């Protein structure tokens, strides 16, 4: 080997470090980015005025479910008769099972895209066929969001909650005939309604839960997610705006166990 005074025979420490870092540097992990979407909201101010806004917020279940209960075309019972959900406005008197007609405080909606509709958990809607829960319940086919809750009356609810009723997720009633999941062929708007309390609204003859965050939501989400959720409710300073959860919710498993006599 020919010796050259300008080139070291043994690599220096810095050369080893540079070569090793180049050879063994772990690839950078891509940052996880949460998809966002526009949510359309309208609400009633303390002065009784109607306001509208579009809020860009994360496309995550806790946010989406706040604005997704029923699809466009659902007929909501009001003091003046059935009104399509897309034609409702804050301040209108909506018929509730517990309180009779009360002012609608908030409407949230977003457009479910075709791509989302092809995602089984988040996108699929549930078609509830006419008379699925009895005569005119519903009066006509109804499209509900995956996290919609239907008022479920059964004596076995009393052993769980002390009363014979609870809200049950629509997917608990899926049977492939009267209630089944569908994937819309085109984008479709979904809506939810909110009051200053938990309420049972009458939609096309069946009873649905209005928006309510639930008793444990605040403990289950971080401050950032809580802030994102509250941006959808300009009239509320906190999740306690919606009052206590007076009617409990059952899980899909619990509903099926009750119906099967377990």
Question: Could you tell me what each predicted segment is?
Answer:
Residues 86-93:
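Structural motif
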Residues 76, 84-86:
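A short acidic-Thr-Gly-centered motif at the start of a beta-strand
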Residues 2-53, 77, 187-262:
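Sequence-level preference for short, compositionally simple segments enriched
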Residues 71-78, 97-102, 106-221:
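Long beta-strand-rich cores associated with HINT superfamily self-processing modules
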């Amino acid at each position: 080997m020919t010796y050259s005074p300008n080139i070291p025979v043994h690599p220096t420490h810095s050369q080893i470090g540079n070569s090793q870092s180049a050879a063994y540097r772990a690839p950078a992990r891509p940052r996880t980015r949460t998809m966002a979407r526009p949510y359309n909201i309208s609400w009633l101010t303390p002065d009784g005025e109607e306001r509208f806004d579009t809020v860009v917020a994360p496309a995550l279940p806790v946010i989406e479910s706040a604005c997704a209960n029923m699809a466009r075309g659902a007929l909501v019972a009001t003091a003046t008769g059935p009104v399509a959900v897309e034609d409702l406005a804050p301040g209108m008197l909506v018929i509730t099972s517990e309180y009779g007609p009360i002012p609608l405080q908030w409407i949230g909606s977003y457009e479910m895209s075709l791509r989302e509709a092809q995602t089984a958990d988040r996108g699929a809607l549930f078609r509830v066929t006419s008379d699925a829960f009895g005569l005119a319940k519903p009066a006509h086919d109804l499209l509900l969001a995956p996290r919609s809750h239907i008022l479920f009356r059964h004596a076995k609810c009393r052993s769980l909650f002390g009363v014979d009723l609870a809200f049950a997720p629509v997917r608990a009633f899926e049977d492939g005939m009267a209630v089944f999941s569908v994937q819309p062929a085109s984008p479709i708007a979904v809506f939810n309604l909110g009051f200053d309390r938990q309420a049972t609204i009458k939609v096309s003859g069946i009873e649905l839960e209005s928006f309510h965050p639930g008793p444990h939501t605040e403990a289950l989400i971080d401050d950032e997610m809580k802030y994102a959720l509250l941006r959808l409710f300009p009239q509320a300073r906190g999740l306690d705006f919606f009052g206590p959860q007076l009617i409990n919710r059952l899980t899909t498993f619990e509903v099926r166990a009750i119906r099967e006599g377990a």
